[in-house]
Amino acid sequence: MRLYALSVSLLAAITLLACVIASADSNMVSQMKRRLSQDVSETEITELSESKKPTAQDIDNEERAQLTLLSDSQAIVAVAEKAAHSSPKVLGGTSALATTKFALQSQKTSRLRQLLDKVMKISGLLKKFLNFFKNKKTNTVPKLENKPHNAFDTV
């Protein structure tokens, strides 16, 4: 009976540990997303404030002048190339930094997931162990009650 009580309390502790690990995992992922978005937005703000870029109207006028010189197919290629070259400039050096941070966080997350898997396996084994004790306890031969074997006593 003591072994049964010990295994029940151990199962409860492991289940609690699994819940803590799962909540830590989800909290870490949400914090990681917030940090990455803050890092990117702060870097974008500093890059935009440091570099003096022409206004949107100047860019539009320049693009219109260039596009009138090109044919339609060349214009499409030029716009695609400009878009491909402008996106890394917006993120700047933070894309590599964000990728590195994400990789480090995902390693921690994968370690937590592996730990959670191990805890769940142990929990499953303990549940099987407890079920074995329950079945062993209920599979005992029932005690015979002293009943009179009289046909008139059936109710």
UniProtKB/Swiss-Prot annotation:
Q: Does the keyword Secreted apply?
A: yes
The lineage's top-level taxon is Eukaryota
Instruction: State its location(s).
Output: Secreted; Host cell membrane
Q: Does the keyword Transferase apply?
A: no
In chain numbering, where does the motif RxLR-dEER fall? 34-64
Where is the signal peptide, in residue numbers? 1-24
The stated induction of this gene product is: Expression is up-regulated during the early plant infection stages.
Coiled coil, from the record: none
Name the UniProt key words of this record, in alphabetical order. Host cell membrane, Host membrane, Membrane, Secreted, Signal, Virulence
Q: Give me the Gene Ontology terms describing cellular component.
A: extracellular region; host cell plasma membrane; membrane
According to the UniProt entry, the note on domains is: Has the canonical translocation RxLR motif, but lacks the canonical EER motif, which characterizes most oomycete effectors identified so far.
Which protein family is it in? Belongs to the RxLR effector family.
**Role played:** Secreted effector that does not suppress pattern-triggered immunity (PTI) in plant host.
Question: What is the protein's given name?
Answer: Secreted RxLR effector protein RXLR-C301
- Organism equals Plasmopara halstedii (Downy mildew of sunflower)
The organism's lineage is:
Eukaryota, Sar, Stramenopiles, Oomycota, Peronosporales
